[in-house]
Amino acid sequence: MQNEKEGAFKLNNEIVINMEEKVFNGDMLDIGMDNYGVIYNIYKKNNTDFNVEYIDNKKGLDFIKNNSYDICVMFLSFSSIMLKANKQKLVKKICDYLREDGLFYIWDLDKKYGRILNENVKVKISDDITKQIIFKEFNIFKESSYESTKNILNDFFDIIDFKCSDGGYYIKAQKRRRSEYEKIENIISGDKF
């Protein structure tokens, strides 16, 4: 996976995420529990006139209008959400926030039940900018594996690109057209057909 531009690979006991060639265009929603500054720096590097909305807690989501963003990014933050039901609710909200054909990007670490994580993550943003992150998750009941994340996204998004290796994963998904997921939305919200 070392030649993959957006994937993760292990090098000297570090998970390395290469984002040197990543470009985001359009209005972006950056959802994260910790502000690592990675996504903002990449976005700023490639856009002179830009709109990035950063949300770092659940309350911030209440003020977002539907169909407002072209892109949503979660960088090392999807795994911080406890319970599959909460992840499903968030993904549904993100789907609503995105414009038609909007893109949802996730970079995270592959954590299964019963495991703890204490990883050094090196993010290569450009030739001269590298970010070091220490990622710790000691809750053995939290699960945020690539497979479970992909399954949660499948209800509202089409996965158009993914990479999973050496403890990390990347998913790029595109919002489905509303008619394709209205039934799922009704089931989640408790409405009957």
What are these regions (language model features)?
Residues 23-37:
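Conserved class I S-adenosyl-L-methionine
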